């Protein structure tokens, strides 16, 4: 099986992929100080819970936006699985897509991998929205070329900034409100409405502007760890695919094995 690793700013997702299907997935908080040995102990226990031995892992592929975490993940692959980790965007794991932007070298690995997965699954023009530490909007044309996008603070970052700057505001949990009312009657309700429905308005407004700029119908795909948070109140998503990055890593690995 393939061990696909998506190392983000907040969490690292490890997934077992077999024949394109995700067999198991686990999530751990990102900590660049965590050693290969610590990852190995954690993974060994989870593999056992799923009824697997570490010998089932035949290859490892990594996409990361946290450079300091990469070394120990590579050591994990070599020391405990006996393989050299493949790293998305680093030879021989080329993107296989056109990054049609002014600074292609600065496109995040997770965003490029998402483009690969989404284009294979959905022909035509696409808008990808990845809800994570940052909220990113990416435009992909019908040929599969990445045309650019938007980077905004993630919803939890916005809450953190608000609470840090306003001494009397309490820490609240971000969740989808039960109703669509935007007139809160308590401080906590008003904060949740402001953060949550402010994000809903941002999503709807930016997608409308992007569609107008594209000038053609575009499929809107939501992904990332927080994508389902907006499912109740955002009606413009054509598809919610939380595992898009892992699926993209699987596609890249298969392409490397079999050729384009």
From Swiss-Prot:
What is the annotated localization of this protein? Cytoplasm
Name the positions where K(+) binds.
130
Positions binding ATP in this chain are 6-13, 133
InterPro entries the UniProt entry points to: ATPase_NBD, Type_III_PanK
Please give the CDD domains that the UniProt record associates with this protein.
ASKHA_NBD_PanK-III
Name of the top EC class for this enzyme: transferase
Q: Name one GO cellular component term.
A: cytoplasm
Q: Which residues bind substrate?
A: 108-111, 187
* Required cofactor names: NH4(+); K(+)
One MF term from GO for this chain?
ATP binding
Cite the cofactor comment.
A monovalent cation. Ammonium or potassium.
Q: How does it assemble?
A: Homodimer.
Q: Which HAMAP family match?
A: Pantothen_kinase_3
> What's the name of the protein?
Type III pantothenate kinase
The organism named in the record is Rhizorhabdus wittichii (strain DSM 6014 / CCUG 31198 / JCM 15750 / NBRC 105917 / EY 4224 / RW1)
